[in-house]
């Protein structure tokens, strides 16, 4: 991880330098656990304390899929998606991950016993998957929560109508 941080802080690192960096097998992330989804059962919303359900875990680095980028997250925020996820309201996000996991072999990797939260980020691209043309290793990026596949014509005029649009880090795993 130190090599990644050194490259990010360097004024001289080029895209090829970032692409050549060794990637760790795991990283630290804020998660909620599937076996704790009932921990707040019977409590009013105001009595649910996110500090009880949020964990700082070492998690395996996920396989990079087509159209995806691996980003070294330098900043993220707590927003309503993070709070909802942490108190399992209005429903547990694990139901979204299970449903998404049934769509394809690639999306199956999202259905895990933990959920890495975060629906926005600022960071530096380390790797890109097949089909990513606008970004390259070393690019500084920000990301927001909307993930749109645009495989259906329903979303071509209005991405909010895409039946496959999801909120990244809320309805998908591997958040920021």
Language model features by range: what are they?
Residues 81, 148-159:
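Short, Lys/Arg- and Gly-enriched loop/turn segments at beta-strand edges
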Residues 31-33, 87, 125:
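Residue-level signal for short segments within beta-strands and strand-turn junctions
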């Amino acid at each position: 991880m130190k090599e990644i941080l050194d490259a990010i802080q360097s004024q001289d690192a080029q895209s090829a330098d970032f692409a050549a960096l060794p990637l760790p097998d795991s990283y630290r992330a804020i998660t909620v656990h599937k076996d704790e989804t009932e921990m707040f059962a019977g409590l009013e919303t105001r009595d649910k304390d996110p500090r009880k359900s949020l964990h700082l875990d070492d998690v395996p680095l996920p396989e990079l899929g087509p159209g995806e980028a691996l980003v070294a997250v330098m900043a993220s925020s707590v927003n309503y998606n993070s709070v909802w996820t942490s108190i399992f309201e209005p429903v547990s996000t694990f139901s979204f991950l299970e449903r998404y996991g049934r769509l394809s072999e690639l999306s199956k990797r999202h259905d895990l016993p933990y959920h890495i939260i975060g629906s926005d980020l600022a960071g530096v691209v380390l790797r890109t998957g097949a089909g990513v043309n606008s970004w390259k290793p070393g690019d500084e990026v920000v990301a927001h929560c909307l993930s749109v596949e645009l495989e259906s014509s329903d979303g071509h005029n209005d991405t909010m109508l895409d039946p496959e649009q999801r909120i990244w880090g809320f309805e998908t795993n591997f958040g920021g």
